[in-house]
Amino acid sequence: MAMIRHSNSRRVLVAHNVSRGNSGGMARLMESIHTELESFGWKTEYFTADDMPASGGQRYRRYAFTWFARRRAREAFLRGEPFDVINIHEPSGAAIVLGRSRMGGPAVVAMSHGLEQRYWELRLRKDPPGPDPPTWKTRLLFPATSLWQSRFTLRRADHVFCLNEEDKSFLADRFHLHPENITRVFPAAGPEFSSAANRRNYDRPCNRVLFSGTWIERKGIRQVIEVFSVLSGRHPSMRLGILGAGVPASSVLADFSASLHSRITVHPPLSHPDCAEALLGYDVFLSPSFFEGTPLALIEAMCTGIPVVTTATCGMKDVVEDGRNGLLVAPGNSGAIVRSVELLINDSSLRRRLGKQAAEDAARKYTWRAAAEIVNAAYSGLLKSKADHR
């Protein structure tokens, strides 16, 4: 059914099953890039967890999200305002890629924030000290509900965005996607983080360590607990900060010895300026994840000039060069993390050199404008390809 288009602007629907304005990296990444895309002539609409019906429970809303997103796109088509591009998170895209013709034939871009298939295989390996293997219930339900949808979406989408080189290679080698149909997207940080770097003090005592991320096993929280337990015993003035946990402070503190609670600060959700200011209050940044895309929190930290200790995997090893702009350790190696932190504790010149190089690299490479230019090129290429094949 042909409809009369009422607008000449280029329209994109971003459909990701998280809340808008969420302090988590996924929402911030997508909103920041697409806000910047307005200067390229794009008009963005969002379909998020906030738009789902409150009834039915969390599991229902998760599985039904793809159908409600499809309905939103169909309604836009019927009123003469079809979307040119739909950016859909990989585990939620099956109904979108199946129903393109009923939505006006938009280009479909599958967005991965860390490939579901790769993390699933990591969990199945049972290689200590990696993440715990899935329960038998999860082994049955996850492939039958979410994992198949991720595979289907990635293979059927017109284009795929990913957040690290390992994922990009996996998509080409295992999913047999053409390299031209894969774009590596970078997270970025706003100017409030870069400007904070000018006020960092590398000469004060190094006794405050920060972990920023959701308080889940995949982020390496067991290693955070182990590392701080050791460091606090060796260094009486050592303090730990936790930012963006996504769970109540009481839940985080319950994972530590009660004797350490007075030395731990669990920050509430912070605005971007307040987050940049909070980062200035710490001396070392820990990112011990087993699996990620590329952590937005890592880029923000680097922008403020805080020396980082992170794992040599996923997007972390794409942006951190060991000994140049940060320190890399093997995933799960708590002892190596302790040694790296103590190396920084004992050497202010090393803290300064790594931190300043991190700030310089991040300010130069990881801006929202640069990220939007990459996304605009991919979107525009898809529209040109569609026009050429009409």
Residue spans for each PLM region:
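Conserved donor-binding/catalytic core segment of Leloir-type glycosyltransferases
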Residues: 201-228, 241
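Conserved acidic donor-binding segment of nucleotide-sugar-dependent glycosyltransferases
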Residues: 322-323, 327-334, 343-349
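Aromatic "clamp/platform" in nucleotide-sugar-dependent glycosyltransferases that forms part
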Residues: 290
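A short, well-ordered alpha-helix in the C-terminal region of glycosyltransferases
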Residues: 343, 350-365, 374-377
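Short hydrophobic beta-strand element within catalytic cores of glycosyltransferases
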Residues: 307-310
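Membrane-proximal helix-turn-helix segments that form the acceptor-binding/catalytic region
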Residues: 131-160
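Nucleotide-activated donor-binding/catalytic signature segment of Leloir-type glycosyltransferases, i.e.
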Residues: 251-273
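Glycosyltransferase donor-sugar binding loop
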Residues: 212, 239-252, 268
